Amino acid sequence: MPTISLGTIPMEHGLAVAGILFCLGLVGLMVRRNILFVLMSLEVMMNASALAFIVAGARWAQPDGQVMFILVISLAAAEASIGLAILLQLYRRFHTLDIDAASEMRG
């Protein structure tokens, strides 16, 4: 039985997937009015950039891509926690998750 070597994917394919994910997240960010879907679109965009860092770091065998990945994941976690806190406050005050309702907020 022959051995199958899986190797790594070409850099162009990895960057293409990252670009497609980023574009999908950008479309979701511009089209949706629900703040939960906007946060999810931001997460997809951040993960796409993290994937691009990993692919580029693997191509040149440098650990910089992995370091940037850890930074992006840390920023994504902070963004998710702050975004969900804003989402909860928006829902408690206006009983809706519509972004346009946030323009009525006064502080």
Curated annotation (Swiss-Prot):
Any one of the GO BP annotations: ATP synthesis coupled electron transport
InterPro entries given in the database record: NADH_UbQ_OxRdtase_chain4L/K (IPR001133), NUOK/Mnh_C1-like (IPR039428)
Catalysed reactions listed for this entry: a quinone + NADH + 5 H(+)(in) = a quinol + NAD(+) + 4 H(+)(out)
GO MF annotation list: NADH:ubiquinone reductase (non-electrogenic) activity; quinone binding
Subunit-level organization: NDH-1 is composed of 13 different subunits. Subunits NuoA, H, J, K, L, M, N constitute the membrane sector of the complex.
Assigned protein family: Belongs to the complex I subunit 4L family.
Protein name, per record: NADH-quinone oxidoreductase subunit K
